[in-house]
């Protein structure tokens, strides 16, 4: 037997289910749709290999060839950028976009504009140690960070994805502070 209470309960359940569907639909959506912003994609695709190179440079500093101050900074750079690489790969996955392993290698000029070291420069750095390594590493990391700041600023100007904008904001803030620290080490 259907009572007023049963009808009211069913109506309330239907409203809750409908509301949940609307909320979930708004949260999900088609992540592969054309709504993905090209500035966001360009930033993420470019920043992954950019960060990977900074991590490689940090690994060189952590293998015993660098002074204590450089090693400490290299640890912080690696600790900050490894999780950002993971996060950016997650963003690409959410969008249904493959990682572009050659994003920073379209031309040597493009890579240089973004502060990337060439393979020859990385090899040269790997052959150094002591004060010579420290000085070259600092100079290279300043250039590298300046490129990352430019990339982050471009993402902040043209991007729309909230997660991408948060990463770009963090990169800009952290790397500007690290540039100041690197310059102090270079001049100190």
Locate the predicted segments by residue.
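C-terminal motif of bacterial Sec signal peptides marking the signal peptidase cleavage site
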Residues: 23-26
